[in-house]
Curated annotation (Swiss-Prot):
GO MF entries: ATP binding; GTP binding; metal ion binding; nucleotidyltransferase activity
Family: Belongs to the mab-21 family.
Gene3D superfamilies, sorted: 1.10.1410.40, 3.30.460.90
Name recorded for this polypeptide: Cyclic GMP-AMP synthase-like protein
Length: 346
């Protein structure tokens, strides 16, 4: 069996059946709808401004491995006044609102998160459980309380758990993109929205009012029709997951960003082994340079989310994995050898 077939087999091992995925997804939808309904019940303002949930992360890109037990959701908010994004730099923006008293006035990120935190706490003041239509009873807890970006809900039923990262977001059209360069073609930006999410900008003169751009739908659209791109991303995520302790804070979005920068330059029709070695090699190069440009704003370094020691550890261990991948690819290693790299039992 060729090395390319080994990697294809690994990919199949990392995946789950559509039926199993559907069960988790249905239960997740019931849980998230319950939480939203409870937020509407306890907070009048939330009831008025909530504008729907928008899926993000690996599940939106359809590259989620194993069970769909982690959901990234943008919690869209639409207030009864105009909000305009104004650029700062490095992917950061202010949100200017037309208010009656002061015009314009910036949306205050801390005040926004405090309000949402209070609403969540009202819901979870008492023990929360939900019985799904599949007759499972989940206990719900409110964990990360929006002090970073997300409000996290953990749902547990026996050995089964599902987590939800709910990130407050303001939705904008492509015509409202605040920076000089739009990173995607017009047919994408004109048909899909982007979001502003609460994010602190380090060393900012106005750190309490900064937001950051994100555009998961743009990224999803430009990744379409790229043959093996998504499969390579799945393999990179599987390799990262197998060595997560040795690759601290190396996020799925960082792996995805490595590929986004090579959408047009790489030949995605090549076999999985060749592409995996090439893309993992690019990851190592970025770690060595200690820089990975944000796809939406080149002046922002995505690795800023890691400290220097974490980058050093990631570089050492990613380099070791690259050497092992190269040996497997060039020497025609056995399936057993390749499976070991992914911690997959034979």
């Amino acid at each position: 069996m060729s090395t390319a077939n080994h990697f294809q087999r690994i990919l199949e091992k990392l995946s789950i059946s559509d039926n199993e995925r559907a069960v988790y997804t249905k239960e997740a939808e019931e849980i998230q709808n319950y939480v939203v309904d409870e937020l509407k019940r306890v907070d009048k303002t939330f009831r008025q401004v909530f504008d729907g949930l928008s899926l993000g992360g690996s599940y939106l890109d359809r590259v989620k491995l194993n069970l769909p037990d982690e959901f990234d959701l943008h919690m869209k908010l639409k207030f009864p006044f105009d909000i305009r994004p104004t650029r700062i730099d490095q992917g950061f923006i202010y949100l200017e609102a037309d208010l009656t008293v002061i015009n314009p006035q910036r949306i205050h990120r801390i005040v926004l998160q405090d309000w949402l935190r209070n609403a969540f706490r009202k819901v979870f003041r008492s023990n929360q459980t939900i019985a799904t239509t599949s007759n499972r009873v989940y206990k719900l807890t409110y964990t990360l309380e929006g002090y970073g970006c997300a409000h996290t809900i953990l749902a547990v039923c026996g050995s089964r758990s599902i987590s939800f990262d709910l990130v407050p977001a303001f939705e904008f059209s492509g015509s409202q993109w605040p920076f000089d360069i739009c990173p995607v073609p017009a047919d994408v930006s004109n048909n899909w929205p982007w979001f502003a999410i609460p994010q602190q900008k380090k060393k900012s003169a106005k750190p309490r009012t900064t937001f950051m751009v994100c555009a998961p739908h743009w990224e999803r659209e430009i990744m379409k029709g790229k043959d093996n791109l998504k499969n390579v991303l799945r393999l990179m995520k599987g390799l990262r997951d197998a060595h997560a302790r040795k690759l601290p804070h190396l996020s799925s979005y960082m792996l995805k960003t490595v590929l986004l920068h090579r959408l047009e330059s790489a030949d995605w029709e090549r076999d999985l082994g060749t592409l995996l070695v090439e893309m993992w090699s690019h990851l190592v190069d970025h770690l060595r340079a200690r820089r990975l440009e944000f796809f939406l704003a080149k002046d922002h370094n995505v690795f800023n989310r890691m400290n220097q020691n974490e980058i050093k550890i990631c570089l050492e261990n990613a380099s070791t994995l690259l050497r092992k991948l190269c040996i497997a690819q060039t020497c025609g290693g056995s399936y057993h050898h390749v499976a070991q790299l992914f911690n997959i039992p034979n």
